[in-house]
Amino acid sequence: MVPNPCPCGRLGDGTGACACSGADVTRYAKKMSGPLADRIDMHVTVGRVALADLSAVSNEESSSEIRRRVSQARTLQTLRYERVAGVGCNAHAAGRWIDAHGGVTSEARALLQRAADGLALSARGYHRVLKVARTIADLDESGSVSAAHVAEALRYRQPTSE
């Protein structure tokens, strides 16, 4: 699901072309109900790319390097779940399984618990954050889920606003 930030889709795109009122934006945002939003693992705002940046040389991680890291993380997950019926990756694992067997450090668990209380996360939301944190740890080639992995997963959990 990729909702626009406002009815016209131009809010925060840097062009200044959005003519939506604050009430329009609020009304539009409310269309995504709590239960629906709770089922979205990651909220990421992707800004408009300037035309000049499309051909610019970048020092960012290359697509081939990202592909390699994702492939390696998927291999780790396949090995992790080889004895768990019907599960081949973190997204398909039971949240309780990851909580019990996913290498979550005590600091990470404490941070997630504080965040769950402070953000009023549902059980589903708690486990989705945990699954994303486990995936971030896999991308970092870490055997354990640290508080930093949980903190990053929590940043993706919160809907962004412009």
Predicted regions mapped to residue ranges:
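Basic, amphipathic alpha-helical bundle interface domains used for macromolecular binding and assembly
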Residues: 1-162
